[in-house]
Amino acid sequence: MKHLAFGFALMLVLAGCGGETSGSRSVSASGFSPLNAPFHYEGWLLQTDNSNVTRWVSFGKFNVDAQGNLVKLAGGPFEIESYGPNRGSTTYAKISIENSQVNSTPSASTLLAGPVTLGESPLSATDVQAFGTNFVGATGTFRLETPTASPVNTNGLSGAWFRNSALGASLNLPTLPSGWRYQAWATIGTVTVSMGRFTAVTSADSGNPHKGPGVAPLVPGEDFLAAAPGGLTFPLTGSTTPMSLIGQPIFVTVEAEPDPAVTPSQYVILRGVAASGATVGSSVVMSNQASGKFPTFSLTVF
């Protein structure tokens, strides 16, 4: 998903009723990316009705166009559809990723959230209703090796696994809430290839379609030995371009589940590149990329 930054502001006057206080609310946002249909973003407000039942009420579905403008699903500039029948009781807001245009409750894929109060109410990925973390403490390494080759480590610079020299898990990542998965990727030449989706760093990932005949380790990773996608030849050897994973970016993203795209999201958490001179068994330190990767959204009530 291509990262597109945008800004907008909407001013809406809400008429007070049933003892509610009249007021104006402005909405501002930036850093969202377009989602492939039928996926879209949706805003929600947590409200309590006259029967003291608390529920999430939608304030509109939206997406982002190629120019970075916030748009309604049917086209045209996004406008708040409704603040719900009990807007005066609103205490919380969140933005989710949805894959159905007919839904009465939010999906598990909450991207941003935060309490709503008088004044500015920013929604954040760090809120407990969203991820509960900014991911900037995440760390990791990967090891160049091909444990599924026969013999082991044949074409050993054609594989990358998230384990250390003691063969233990080498990623330190926050636990994700329901509705999200990590996914590892390798950009080999000009082609970005999935290395699998996972939630636990001490378990196998979602699959290893490019591995050799051997058994894969119980950690995320991939051997690029077989079933190469178009534009590549596996294994990566001295006669292929590129010749190995040296110089090829390996990175980890956060992806919605289900996923709006087969390409990496903008939410890149870790990235590493094996330097020239790396050998089979070398561990490569990954740098944290999380800062600024998540969008912002805020409500201002005054």
Regions inferred by a protein language model and the residue ranges of each:
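N-terminal targeting/export leaders
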Residues: 17-302
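Hydrophobic helical h-region of N-terminal Sec-dependent signal peptides
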Residues: 6-10
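Positively charged n-region of N-terminal signal peptides that target proteins for export
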Residues: 1-5
